[in-house]
From Swiss-Prot:
Residue stretches making up the VWFA domain: 421-610
Annotated protein name in UniProt: Uncharacterized protein PA0525
Keyword Ribonucleoprotein: no
InterPro entries assigned to the protein according to its UniProt record, in alphabetical order: NorD/CobT (IPR051928), VWF_A (IPR002035), vWFA_dom_sf (IPR036465)
GO cellular component terms, A-Z: cytoplasm
Highest taxon, organism lineage: Bacteria
Lineage: Bacteria, Pseudomonadati, Pseudomonadota, Gammaproteobacteria, Pseudomonadales
Classification via Pfam families: VWA
Amino acid sequence: MAFAVELEEWVGAHWHRFITRHASGEFEAARVTLESMRRPLGMLFRALGGAPGVALEATPARRLLLRRTWLQRVAGTCEQAPVSWFNGDSLRLPESLAVYPQAELNRELYRWLALLAASAGPLRHWAQDNQRWARQLLDAYPALRPRYARLVAAHLRQRPSLDDCPAADAELEIALRRALAEPGSVERFPRVERAPWPVPLWLYPGERWTPSASAEDGEEAAAGAGKRQVARSGARKRAERIEERNSERNLLLFRLESLLSWSEHLALDRCSDDEDDPDGARVAEDLDYLSLSRQRTQKGGGLRLDLDLPAADYDDLPLGPGLKLPEWDYRQQRLLSDHVLLQPMRPRGATSASLPAHLEKTALHLRRQFACLRDGRQRLRQQPQGDEIDLDAWLDFQVERRRGGSTQPGLFLEQRPRRRDLACLLLADLSMSTEAYLDDQRRVIDSIVDSLLLFGEALQALGDPFALYGFSSVRRQQVRWQVLKDFDEGYGGEVRGRVLALSPGYYTRMGAAIRRASQVLGGQPQKRRLLLLLSDGKPNDLDRYEGRYGIEDTRQAVIEARSQGLVPFCITIDKEAADYLPYLFGADGFALVERAGQLPERLLQLYRRLRR
């Protein structure tokens, strides 16, 4: 019996692979992933005028009401198709493409979709709008025509045969083929009951997403995210909200003798299992829709106490009532006045401290090194009076006099004190992601603390005015501004104690922090004012401050800082920084530190370079 079962499973597995391979319309050997094309696609999209703040994300295959062949119905394939869409905020491309038998054609299809999206506008009529965008793109860039022709020719060979289509479907198929071959040549398309075979070269209407979760949902999602990391794709799913069944209001609506029959098909209020399904993540990958419960309790839930603000007796010490700051809403294209409350704070329990022992040797070397760069006295040549004779000027004067010149000589060298004309504000991102471990002993926050301490030691020896601050946030009403050292405060044990008392915070409302830093730095009298930002990720917060909204607000804050004559510069350890920091700070406005442990050393190297 066991052998028969194993044989049946073996035959079934081989039959499944055989039938799906012959019925599938994809070519696995030529599959190309979006992740491998993400950077060049972003460059293409922005080079042709696409908004820099638009996110490039993966989207799952979409279920379409297609007319499938008998073999496809038997195999259960071709129910979903990889389609692309663009809604102005994000460009959604398939997680992978295998629609062509050649990998290069699949890469070319990715490039075409990115270029088409850069030319796209609001989608009102699927076929007419895609024709218009394609025609505009090909007219503006004739060099694209051969590439587009290759994609169309390869796709037309894969479309259903006209002989196998009903009359109405065949009429639509002819119109689509003509529209693909000659964009703009077809104005009217016949109506049919089923969707036409997918057109991977066109953009489809965007998905209708359910409203974002409430604030409470956001906290629970953030708390649950830290429990366990499951390997999964980057594609987003469509979602719908459902009401969770309440196990406390069960009502017996059936007779017990029917328990195993029709009762199983009734929409009864049954309680759910409290344990997490170990196969849930795998099953979710195969679903088109995810049903999201409004139930506040979690299955197998754990607590993330660090996501909630601590009690006042244990929280950091607030300094004053807080400051109201504006925030940029890119949808309305205006600043929302007094939208954010920034609370200055100091770490609780911070006491005067000396430099940690593991930094003493490095600090001594840096103090000596930066002391050599300390501003001293500058020598001015050809002065009418001074401390010593300028020999070069005297020789020039003698030559001119013998030639008959009568230039009034400036024969002296004068030494004057060199004015320090640079002020620097160092702003550190203290979000919860800094709690991540670099190795078995050190965290990201430890590297940031070392960077702040060594930066203070070096600039104290150099003599440049500087200030140290940190920030994190919990929604717009709680942007926590850690005051470590003001410009008018000396660097010493008190400042070291505050830095050593730092701990990972919450989220990253970067725009508000940059605006406050610009206010502080803008009040300094120095001609050159440098704003350095230490960061480890994108701007994000609980209340819609993520994605393009957070990116655009941060960019606007950087623009405001530059308009005040400040020089903002970001130093990051985020390996994906190249995807968004050029838009925020410019191509030369940021530096990536590959290893977080090298942050202290690289910070001071960059400061020396920027100081010149």
